Amino acid sequence: MSNAEASRVYEIIVESVVNEVREDFENAGIDEQTLQDLKNIWQKKLTETKVTTFSWDNQFNEGNINGVQNDLNFNLATPGVNSSEFNIKEENTGNEGLILPNINSNNNIPHSGETNINTNTVEATNNSGATLNTNTSGNTNADVTSQPKIEVKPEIELTINNANITTVENIDDESEKKDDEEKEEDVEKTRKEKEQIEQVKLQAKKEKRSALLDTDEVGSELDDSDDDYLISEGEEDGPDENLMLCLYDKVTRTKARWKCSLKDGVVTINRNDYTFQKAQVEAEWV
């Protein structure tokens, strides 16, 4: 990928991100200037990486040149330093920028410290194009470095993070609410389907029972009340017979032999009561 194409990709990404977060900034009450400041900081960091040439490089380079010239004018205008005593010397060094080591003067100016100047790709020189190296008899040190320093206000970052968190929480609440509603609808739908199935099963059982009662397989002999075997003659304390009370699914007859499929019944055998869910019975009447 060529430098021009790479630069264009970076610029598209920066503009896209800024446009996407603009609405969030407005909702959070953050003005447009803050967004532009963050955009400029991002562009400045990209310029410092020197991965390619960007369209905004000149903007930051002009600002850095003005800062270097102002600092140079301030140092040259320091009281007690005779500018006519400066010696201009050309040196080939690997460091870019302006180097002002050991400015000495007879007046012993109490000035020392480090001055950080942000530079990118611009090399600051005097009018002759040479690096200034001045020596006098005083003790004043001024170190100029080319390391950039980017400061972002923590309160701006905190406000942005709070805005993003609020947006994410609102989205999560809406999603959870929608999921709960869908779950309730599914539960209600399942309950109705179960009720319909139970009704169909109950109706089928009723129809099956009615069909069995209407067939010839079940004769009047089962319903004959002439055999009052529930009443025991000569017994005052109750029946002494083996009794069974249950429902039947199917009854078939072959001559005098009966075969029954019984369910959900109670049976009394030798005066002991038992319950059962299903039973197969064969009986013969003589």
From Swiss-Prot:
Kindly list the biological process annotations in GO that this record carries.
Answer: positive regulation of transcription by RNA polymerase II; positive regulation of transcription initiation by RNA polymerase II; RNA polymerase II preinitiation complex assembly; transcription by RNA polymerase II; transcription initiation at RNA polymerase II promoter
Superkingdom of the source? Eukaryota
Indicate whether Cytoplasm appears among the record's keywords.
yes
Basic and acidic residues biased stretches: 175-195
Respond yes or no to whether keyword Transcription is given for this record: yes
**Cellular compartment(s):** Cytoplasm; Nucleus
What are the GO cellular component annotations?
Answer: cytoplasm; nucleus; transcription factor TFIIA complex
Ranges of Acidic residues composition bias in the record: 214-236
Positions of region (Disordered): 120-145, 167-195, 208-236
Query: Which terms does the record give in the GO molecular function aspect?
Result: RNA polymerase II core promoter sequence-specific DNA binding; TBP-class protein binding; transcription coregulator activity
Keywords associated with the record: Cytoplasm, Nucleus, Transcription
Family classification: Belongs to the TFIIA subunit 1 family.
Q: How does it assemble?
A: TFIIA is a heterodimer composed of the large TOA1 and a small TOA2 subunits. Interacts with KAP122.
Which purpose does this protein serve, as stated in its record? Answer: TFIIA is a component of the transcription machinery of RNA polymerase II and implicated in the regulation of basal transcription. Interacts with TBP (the TATA-binding protein).
Name it.
Transcription initiation factor IIA large subunit
